[in-house]
Protein backbone atom coordinates (compact mmCIF):
# COMPACT_ATOMS: atom_id res chain seq x y z
CA UNK A 1 0.00 0.00 0.00
CA UNK A 2 1.10 3.57 -0.48
CA UNK A 3 2.13 6.10 2.11
CA UNK A 4 -0.52 8.82 2.23
CA UNK A 5 1.94 11.39 3.56
CA UNK A 6 4.01 11.15 0.36
CA UNK A 7 1.16 12.05 -1.99
CA UNK A 8 1.12 15.15 -4.14
CA UNK A 9 -1.62 17.71 -3.73
CA UNK A 10 -3.58 17.29 -6.98
CA UNK A 11 -4.23 21.04 -7.15
CA UNK A 12 -0.50 21.69 -7.66
CA UNK A 13 -0.15 19.66 -10.85
CA UNK A 14 -0.92 22.07 -13.65
CA UNK A 15 2.33 24.02 -13.78
CA UNK A 16 2.05 24.98 -17.46
CA UNK A 17 5.20 23.15 -18.60
CA UNK A 18 3.41 20.41 -20.53
CA UNK A 19 1.14 22.30 -22.88
CA UNK A 20 0.72 22.21 -26.65
CA UNK A 21 0.62 25.40 -28.68
CA UNK A 22 -3.16 25.48 -28.28
CA UNK A 23 -2.85 25.67 -24.50
CA UNK A 24 -4.01 22.07 -23.97
CA UNK A 25 -2.15 19.80 -21.58
CA UNK A 26 -0.25 16.95 -23.22
CA UNK A 27 -1.48 13.40 -22.71
CA UNK A 28 1.51 12.73 -20.43
CA UNK A 29 0.72 15.80 -18.33
CA UNK A 30 -2.92 14.71 -18.10
CA UNK A 31 -1.78 11.24 -17.02
CA UNK A 32 0.33 12.74 -14.22
CA UNK A 33 -2.60 14.86 -13.13
CA UNK A 34 -5.12 12.01 -13.11
CA UNK A 35 -2.62 9.65 -11.48
CA UNK A 36 -1.90 12.16 -8.71
CA UNK A 37 -5.63 12.56 -8.05
CA UNK A 38 -5.99 8.77 -8.06
CA UNK A 39 -3.08 8.33 -5.65
CA UNK A 40 -4.56 10.96 -3.37
CA UNK A 41 -7.96 9.25 -3.35
CA UNK A 42 -6.37 5.83 -2.81
CA UNK A 43 -4.24 7.20 0.01
CA UNK A 44 -7.34 8.75 1.54
CA UNK A 45 -9.13 5.41 1.27
CA UNK A 46 -6.19 3.55 2.84
CA UNK A 47 -5.96 6.01 5.71
CA UNK A 48 -9.71 5.81 6.27
CA UNK A 49 -9.55 2.01 6.34
CA UNK A 50 -6.77 2.21 8.94
CA UNK A 51 -8.89 4.65 10.97
CA UNK A 52 -11.75 2.16 11.21
CA UNK A 53 -9.42 -0.80 11.76
CA UNK A 54 -9.73 -2.51 8.38
CA UNK A 55 -6.45 -4.31 7.61
CA UNK A 56 -5.27 -4.46 4.01
CA UNK A 57 -5.49 -8.26 4.14
CA UNK A 58 -9.26 -8.00 4.69
CA UNK A 59 -9.70 -7.75 0.91
CA UNK A 60 -11.52 -10.69 -0.64
CA UNK A 61 -11.94 -11.50 -4.32
CA UNK A 62 -15.67 -11.72 -3.72
CA UNK A 63 -16.26 -9.27 -0.86
CA UNK A 64 -18.73 -10.55 1.70
CA UNK A 65 -19.13 -7.51 3.91
CA UNK A 66 -18.43 -3.79 4.19
CA UNK A 67 -14.86 -4.20 5.48
CA UNK A 68 -13.85 -6.62 2.74
CA UNK A 69 -15.55 -4.38 0.13
CA UNK A 70 -13.54 -1.38 1.30
CA UNK A 71 -10.26 -3.32 1.42
CA UNK A 72 -10.95 -4.87 -1.99
CA UNK A 73 -11.75 -1.48 -3.56
CA UNK A 74 -8.50 -0.06 -2.19
CA UNK A 75 -6.51 -3.05 -3.44
CA UNK A 76 -7.97 -2.70 -6.95
CA UNK A 77 -7.18 1.02 -7.00
CA UNK A 78 -3.59 0.45 -5.89
CA UNK A 79 -3.12 -2.17 -8.61
CA UNK A 80 -4.66 -0.03 -11.33
CA UNK A 81 -2.49 2.95 -10.43
CA UNK A 82 0.62 0.76 -10.35
CA UNK A 83 -0.15 -0.48 -13.87
CA UNK A 84 -0.65 2.94 -15.44
CA UNK A 85 3.00 3.25 -16.57
CA UNK A 86 2.68 -0.03 -18.49
CA UNK A 87 0.40 1.59 -21.08
CA UNK A 88 0.47 4.65 -23.28
CA UNK A 89 -1.15 7.75 -21.82
CA UNK A 90 -4.89 7.77 -22.45
CA UNK A 91 -6.63 10.69 -20.72
CA UNK A 92 -10.02 8.98 -20.70
CA UNK A 93 -8.69 5.73 -19.21
CA UNK A 94 -6.43 7.59 -16.79
CA UNK A 95 -9.36 9.70 -15.59
CA UNK A 96 -11.44 6.53 -15.12
CA UNK A 97 -8.64 5.13 -12.96
CA UNK A 98 -8.79 8.27 -10.78
CA UNK A 99 -12.60 8.01 -10.70
CA UNK A 100 -12.41 4.41 -9.52
CA UNK A 101 -9.95 5.36 -6.79
CA UNK A 102 -12.31 8.10 -5.66
CA UNK A 103 -15.17 5.59 -5.58
CA UNK A 104 -13.01 3.31 -3.40
CA UNK A 105 -12.54 6.22 -1.02
CA UNK A 106 -16.33 6.57 -0.77
CA UNK A 107 -16.66 2.91 0.24
CA UNK A 108 -14.14 3.49 3.03
CA UNK A 109 -15.79 6.79 3.97
CA UNK A 110 -19.12 5.01 4.46
CA UNK A 111 -17.47 2.78 7.06
CA UNK A 112 -15.76 5.71 8.78
CA UNK A 113 -18.97 7.73 8.81
CA UNK A 114 -20.69 4.97 10.77
CA UNK A 115 -17.63 4.49 12.98
CA UNK A 116 -17.16 8.17 13.84
CA UNK A 117 -20.80 9.30 13.86
CA UNK A 118 -19.91 12.98 14.27
CA UNK A 119 -20.63 16.12 12.28
CA UNK A 120 -17.03 16.05 11.04
CA UNK A 121 -17.41 12.44 9.88
CA UNK A 122 -20.63 13.34 8.11
CA UNK A 123 -18.93 16.28 6.40
CA UNK A 124 -15.98 14.09 5.37
CA UNK A 125 -18.34 11.51 3.92
CA UNK A 126 -20.15 14.17 1.88
CA UNK A 127 -16.81 15.58 0.70
CA UNK A 128 -15.79 12.08 -0.41
CA UNK A 129 -19.07 11.77 -2.32
CA UNK A 130 -18.52 15.16 -3.96
CA UNK A 131 -14.97 14.17 -4.96
CA UNK A 132 -16.26 10.95 -6.47
CA UNK A 133 -18.97 12.77 -8.42
CA UNK A 134 -16.46 15.33 -9.72
CA UNK A 135 -14.01 12.59 -10.70
CA UNK A 136 -16.85 10.84 -12.51
CA UNK A 137 -17.70 14.01 -14.41
CA UNK A 138 -14.04 14.50 -15.40
CA UNK A 139 -13.88 10.91 -16.65
CA UNK A 140 -17.32 10.89 -18.24
CA UNK A 141 -18.47 11.31 -21.79
CA UNK A 142 -18.33 15.12 -21.68
CA UNK A 143 -14.87 15.29 -20.10
CA UNK A 144 -13.09 12.16 -21.30
CA UNK A 145 -10.21 13.19 -19.02
CA UNK A 146 -9.34 16.20 -21.20
CA UNK A 147 -11.77 18.93 -20.12
CA UNK A 148 -9.82 21.50 -18.08
CA UNK A 149 -12.76 22.90 -16.07
CA UNK A 150 -13.95 19.39 -15.15
CA UNK A 151 -10.41 18.28 -14.26
CA UNK A 152 -9.92 21.40 -12.13
CA UNK A 153 -13.24 20.74 -10.38
CA UNK A 154 -12.17 17.14 -9.69
CA UNK A 155 -8.78 18.28 -8.37
CA UNK A 156 -10.41 20.84 -6.07
CA UNK A 157 -12.99 18.32 -4.83
CA UNK A 158 -10.23 15.80 -4.07
CA UNK A 159 -8.28 18.43 -2.13
CA UNK A 160 -11.47 19.30 -0.20
CA UNK A 161 -12.08 15.61 0.56
CA UNK A 162 -8.54 15.26 1.91
CA UNK A 163 -9.02 18.33 4.11
CA UNK A 164 -12.38 17.07 5.40
CA UNK A 165 -10.94 13.61 6.14
CA UNK A 166 -8.13 15.25 8.11
CA UNK A 167 -10.60 17.34 10.11
CA UNK A 168 -12.58 14.17 10.88
CA UNK A 169 -9.41 12.46 12.11
CA UNK A 170 -9.48 9.81 9.40
CA UNK A 171 -6.04 10.84 8.17
Indicate where each model-derived feature is located.
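Short, glycine-biased loop/turn motifs at secondary-structure junctions and
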Residues: 1-114, 122-171
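Active-site beta-strand/loop architecture of penicillin-binding DD-peptidases
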Residues: 117
Amino acid sequence: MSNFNDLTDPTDLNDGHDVHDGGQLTEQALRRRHAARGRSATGRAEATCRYVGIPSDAAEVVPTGPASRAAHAVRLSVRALARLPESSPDPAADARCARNASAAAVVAAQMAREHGDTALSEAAFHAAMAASRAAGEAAGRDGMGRDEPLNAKADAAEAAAVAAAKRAGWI
